[in-house]
Every structure is written in structure tokens, then in C-alpha cells.
Amino acid sequence: PYHVGEVISERSRLLLQTPESLRESLDIDVRIATEVVAIDREAKTVSVREVDTGKEYTESYDKLALCMGAEAVRPPLPGIDHPAVEVLRRIGDMDRIKTRLDAAIDAQKAGRRGTVTAVVVGAGYIGLEMAENLHHRGVKVDVVELAPQILPPVDADIAAPVERHLRMRGIGLHLSTAAAAFQPLADADGNDRVSVELNSGTTLKADLVILAAGVKPAVQLVKDAGIELGERGGIKVDTHMRTSDPSIYAAGDAVET
């Protein structure tokens, strides 16, 4: 969020390590733009695909560690795939968001459009950080939250002063409210905007929508391999982080004990 808001101006400062630095310091072979598409537990191999070239090959393993993390939740709502509706989970997401935002702000500065607007769906930590940074860029921000308060995990008396601060800053809060649909919008401010329909009957016009409604474990690869999942849908591991396959371990946001 803070690079989108240009509080952190240099993109490189977000990257604590690079493939080159990991190779030099720890002799780790890091292959970026590369995806594991299948696990053969019996043969102890993984099928690998290079994203840019489509080339596929296999690698063998003695022990395998699964650290795929989580992916942002995209509810099955009408219009959810509109290009103005984004999630912020990875660097690539950030780049797309910033490119769209920069273009809208540049058009505003050139007098070709009015105020840039954004809707943030979800008032957790990521959602509020995005709201803060969009506001920092001069964007008119509305936040939509299903719970009756922002920051649902904390007590109401902690959330209340933050809500007052946001409203004083001109950020709109739509609490106990959900996004119901996203419709393409073309008007004097641009032809690639989106209309956000709320279940309250309110409609918000936006140049950008950020979905910050939580994450879910990235487990499709694991499911396809027949590895056991837990009750909440994460990879089930024991106290040694072993999965149901004793040769395969898992760690991070995708696991549950």
C-alpha cells in the first residue's frame, strides 16, 4: 500500500531479497516466473512450467516443502472480473493498481477529468492501509465493510476513534454493508470505470476498486495431489509441519494444525 501511496517511492525498497542475492548468500536456486503444476507423490517428482515460455519439465525430490501461502478472496459477484476491480496480494497486483491510479491522477492534473475515486471493500488492516494511501494521493475514498465496525477483530471502543478519524479526513464508511455487484461505467471521467452497487441500495462510482475481504489458503495443487486438508481448508500438518505424506512438509499461510 505504501508504494501505491508513494510514501515508499522506490519500488526496489519493497524487495528484501532477489534471486541473485539468495544465490550469492545461501546458494539457493530461485526460479521466478516458474510454477509447479503437479506433484507426483509416488515418483517423488514435481511438474514445473515456465510462465513466460510455457516450457515444462520435471524435478525430483527427497523432501518437499509447500509454502504457497494464501490468495486473496474474490467473491463470486457480478462484474468481479472488471479490470478496475483489483486485489493487493503480490507485487504484480501493486504494479497494476499503481499504473491505473497514476493514469487517473495524471488525467485529473491535466484537466481531462474530475476527482479520482476509489472503493475499498473490506476494513481490515490491508483495506485501511490502502484507504490511507489512496487518500494520501488525493483520491476520494469510500470503504465498504460487512461488519458493524472497521477492524472487525478488535473491540468496538478501539475501532471507534479510528472511524472518527477516517470520517474527519473525508473517507466514506459504509458499515454493515456489502458490495453486491460491479457494473462497467463510462462517463465524462473515463470509459473504463466501474459502478459499485451496495446491498444498501447505494451506488458508488470508482476508477479503482480494491478487494480486501480476506484471504484463503492456496491449496489447489495440494488437493490435486491427494494431500489431506484440515477442517478450515488449509493443509493439515503435525507439530513437525509434516503433511499426510511423510516426505512432504508445509508452512506459512496455507497450513493449519
Residue ranges and their predicted role:
Residues 31-52, 59, 136-239:
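A Rossmann-like FAD-binding core segment of flavoenzymes
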Residues 41, 47-48, 53-116:
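Glycine/serine-rich phosphate-binding loop and adjoining beta1-alpha1 elements at the start
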